[in-house]
Amino acid sequence: MQEIELLPSSEQDNRYIHQQLRQYNRQFMRDFKDYSFHIKQDGQIVAGIVAASTMDTLEVEFLFVEESCRGQGLGRLLLEQAENLARQDGCKRVLLNTYSFQAPGFYRRMGYELLAQQNPCFGEYSQYYFTKNL
């Protein structure tokens, strides 16, 4: 029997695992396309979105705006860019999830509909699952 080791993962390990999962999923979920973008200000990344589509659905994995840059429309700009490009490529909907300490109100203002809410999820926090038709 081969020896196995159970080890904590580094960021590099996590990237490899994520890459392998995406590669595996592509066998079943065709037309995979990345819609990830970032915004730089004075040479520093201050906002970014990590999103990808498969078949006719765009999934937003992460949307982040530096605290000092919030309220300037950067999140809206990133989300609309991903939505518009995905729509042009034939996507029909967007899926995402967020937590009560993040931005559920932002997604509602952006036209997202609540699919499900888990209360509580992590301690006192709730988790929200949203969708939007494109």
Feature-to-residue mapping (PLM):
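Conserved short alpha-helix immediately C-terminal to the canonical SAM/SAH-binding motif I
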Residues: L78, Q102-A103
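Conserved active-site tyrosine of GNAT-family acetyltransferases
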Residues: I17, Y107, Y112
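Conserved catalytic-core motifs of GNAT/GCN5-like acyltransferases
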Residues: L95-N97, E113-Y129
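Conserved GNAT acetyl-CoA-binding A-motif
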Residues: A86-Y99
